[in-house]
Amino acid sequence: MPGGVKEMRCDLAVIGAGIAGLSAALFAANRGIETALVGETGEILFASGLMDLLSVHPLEEGKTWDDPWAALTALRRDIPDHPYARMPAADIAAAFDALLAFLKNQGLPYRRRPDRNVEVPVAMGAVKRTYCVPETVWNGVRALEEKQPCLIVDFDQLRGFSARQIASTLEPRWPGLRTARLPFPGGTFSQQYAEQLAMALEAPRNRASLACDIRACLGAARSVGLPAVLGLYRVQMIFEDLQKRVGVPLFEIPILPPSVAGLRLRDAFHREIGRAHV
């Protein structure tokens, strides 16, 4: 074609390469539909790793819902042209099932309560209501619900994540949180980036060193929250190994973007998109 533009023919073109676009492309390809994906996947790096269904409706009132399916019923009644209103609840549930099955197969298992939203602490000490969370975050859901004695850990020079700020902001809802700032094993950086930390924890010696430092300040804590940097490629293995070394449940706290959670999702989708020939 003129100008060297290559013509491509397909049954379906998906425009947009965020989580929705990537999921749609995979759903289609897995059903034998010849699919092309148009877009840059950079936006997925801004993902927290949390998967929402519906927790606030109407937005202008800021009404929150424990039951996302009841919220969907209200949304369909109030906004009949909304995309959610055009899909049966069973199809939405099946889409979530398919997405979570795919992520589990990619080594990124998720947890949820099928008929309830959950609350999870996130960066800066906010609490987010969501539907599905990574397995590495789930212990934080339980710790917040039970108001467990908990230690929040941050690292020298890691920007955008302060254990003290998180504990201070959560104090009215979760009193008695303790904090610790630790040096990160595996190298000295003038400024630490989340991806560097996640890669460093691929090495067993770094996990052993970090676990030793955490145990030294554990005290009476029954759980430990850390920034979501516990591995990039072997997330579940690294998380379980570090948790075993520390001796109490750990949980990741989603960090500000660009995030390791976004990198994990991007890599998982890229692997599967390549396999599916999208």
Residues of each region from the PLM?
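Dinucleotide-binding Rossmann-like beta1-alpha1 core, especially the glycine-rich loop
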Residues: L53-A143, Q148-F155, I166-P172
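Extreme N-terminal leader/targeting segments of oxidoreductases
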Residues: M1-L12, N30, E43, P58-E60, ...
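Conserved N-terminal glycine-rich FAD pyrophosphate-binding loop of Rossmann-like flavoproteins
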Residues: G39-R76, G186-M199
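Generic secondary-structure signature for well-ordered alpha-helical cores
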Residues: I33, D97-L108, K244-V248, G274
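Alpha-helical scaffold segments in soluble metabolic enzymes
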Residues: F27, D91-A94, A98-A101, Q165, ...
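N-terminal Rossmann-like FAD-binding beta1-loop-alpha1 element of flavoenzymes
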Residues: C10-L37
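Predominantly flavin-linked oxidoreductase catalytic cores and closely associated redox partners
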Residues: T41-F46, V127-H277
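Hydrophobic structural packing positions in well-ordered secondary structure
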Residues: A25-A28, L53, I152, I273
